[in-house]
């Protein structure tokens, strides 16, 4: 069996995260929003705010928890893309926040989710 590409793994992680968020009653507004070179994995609404979600998945914690892979550069890019998303939809000033969904997906096991709300500002 061929090894999954980085993009395939990313899509799988985002599918899992979307299902997780929808199970909490959230509405998914957009996936993989790009502005210039900046990307937001998931844009959702949780009945209080627009939530920009960064998703990270690992097969184990051997090399650290998925959350540890959210770099300062990634945070800057999420801010940039989120500002563009809000501006394009004339939603400047609306409540918004930034969450991280970390997923541990061990082989032949159910995924383990770690959701940090308001993870960065």
What are these regions (language model features)?
Residues 1-3, 58-61, 115-116:
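Short glycine/proline- and charge-enriched loop/turn segments
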Residues 1-31:
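Acidic-basic catalytic patches of nuclease active cores, encompassing PD-(D/E)XK
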Residues 21, 40-61, 78:
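Conserved catalytic cores of phosphodiester-cleaving nucleases, focusing on short active-site segments
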Residues 27, 50, 95:
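Hydrophobic "anchor" residues on beta-strands that sit immediately upstream
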Residues 35-38:
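Short acidic/glycine-enriched loop/turn segments that link adjacent beta-strands
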Residues 59-79, 87-88:
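Mg2+/Mn2+-dependent nuclease catalytic core
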Residues 88-121:
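Domain-level recognition of nuclease-like catalytic cores that cleave nucleotide substrates
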């Amino acid at each position: 069996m061929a090894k999954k590409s980085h993009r395939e793994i990313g899509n799988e992680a985002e599918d899992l995260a979307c299902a997780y968020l929808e199970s909490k009653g959230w509405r998914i507004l957009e996936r993989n929003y790009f502005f210039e070179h900046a990307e937001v994995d998931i844009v959702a609404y949780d009945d209080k705010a627009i939530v920009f979600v960064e998703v990270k998945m690992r097969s184990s914690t051997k090399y650290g928890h998925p959350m540890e892979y959210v770099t300062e550069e990634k945070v800057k890019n999420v801010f940039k893309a989120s500002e563009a998303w809000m501006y394009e939809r004339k939603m400047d000033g609306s409540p918004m926040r930034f969450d991280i969904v970390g997923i541990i997906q061990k082989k032949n096991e159910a995924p383990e989710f770690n959701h940090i709300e308001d993870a960065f500002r």
